[in-house]
């Protein structure tokens, strides 16, 4: 654990120093780091291990990902969903003042930690509890509908409340 953590951190520093070259940076400079789909090169455990020290560095960071695992490591107010529409790509984000503290805590637990991959869905079907989740998914399957392929996720709201989920989904461009 500790040795691998140090190796990853040293690798980050070496890459940053190499990219900096001979350019002298201002003391308050925050370089921009672009990371494209890191989950394609790292095992999920290594991704989690590598992500923590990366967030400690004084950097601006833009990361593209298809990983629910990586999303679960990122505060929802830092997530920006890009949605391809017929004539443009729309950007949706909650932002730092998007939800009150209580709703933010509920969303962080219910979506970020337990259902991060639901942020990739185009549409959420909100149902009351676990039983309804099982029933709706099974009925759809028996009727030949493939929710995953259609970008539909069934989300139960009993634990988090309906209003915070609706508010969050609307702000993030999820129908």
PLM segments and residue spans:
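RecA-like P-loop NTPase motor core
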Residues: 58, 71-72, 77-174
């Amino acid at each position: 654990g500790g040795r691998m953590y140090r190796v990853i951190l040293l690798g980050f520093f070496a890459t940053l120093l190499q990219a900096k070259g001979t350019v002298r940076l201002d003391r308050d400079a925050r370089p921009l780091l672009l990371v494209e789909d890191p989950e394609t090169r790292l095992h999920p455990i290594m991704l989690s291990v590598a992500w923590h020290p990366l967030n400690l560095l004084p950097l601006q960071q833009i990361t593209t990902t298809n990983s629910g695992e990586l999303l679960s490591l990122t505060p929802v107010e830092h997530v920006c969903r890009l949605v391809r529409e017929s004539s443009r790509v729309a950007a949706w984000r909650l932002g730092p003042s998007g939800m009150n503290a209580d709703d933010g805590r509920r969303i962080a637990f219910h979506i970020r930690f337990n259902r991060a991959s639901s942020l990739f869905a185009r549409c959420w079907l909100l149902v009351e509890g676990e039983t309804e989740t099982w029933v709706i998914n099974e009925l759809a399957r028996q009727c030949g509908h493939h929710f995953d392929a259609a970008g539909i996720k069934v989300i139960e709201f009993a634990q988090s409340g309906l209003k915070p989920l609706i508010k969050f989904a609307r702000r993030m461009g999820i129908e």
